[in-house]
Amino acid sequence: MIGMNALGSNGRLGNQMFQYASLVGIAKNLGYDYCIPDHSKVTWFDRMEGDEIITQHHQLQHLFEMNNLGDRFGLIEGGNEIHLEQAEFCKELFDECPHNSTLYGYFESYHYFENAEEELRKDFVIRDHILSAAEKFHKDNKTDHPACISVRRG
């Protein structure tokens, strides 16, 4: 079993999705099971420290169906802590990650999870209440010239 005990404390949603996807892909490559912390009961995700917003909990269970995840919740206790510092794909980690390890890092390469596309597509299905709210917003704010702005913080 491998896990990501700190999922949610190392980046916001995009990073969390990459981290989870990488965990699934690495586990699949090595034939391991995997787990993530259960944050289903969390009602807040960030805290302020001075001028900084610190992310504490992952949002995946709140935003996505996570159909493939099942009940794979938990923490890796007393195992290896693997801190990935590099941005590029680490083939050694992908092929030789030790059993009973928790992963920490950004995992900024699709190569970690290109083998798990089917599983991840089942997990990353947006929850109905979010889709409904988005559809209502678009219906209520219909315009001939829609625009989208993405604000990157950090």
What are these model-predicted stretches?
Residues G8-F18:
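A short, glycine/small-residue-rich beta-strand->loop->alpha-helix junction that serves as a flexible
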Residues T43-G154:
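Secretory-pathway luminal glycosyltransferase catalytic domains
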Residues G25-Y34, L69-G70:
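Structural alpha-beta junctions
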Residues Y32-T43:
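A short beta-strand-loop structural module common to alpha/beta enzyme folds
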Residues L7, P37-D38, S150-V151:
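Short His-Asn-centered micro-motif
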Residues M1-A6:
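Extracellular/lumenal mucin-like low-complexity stalks
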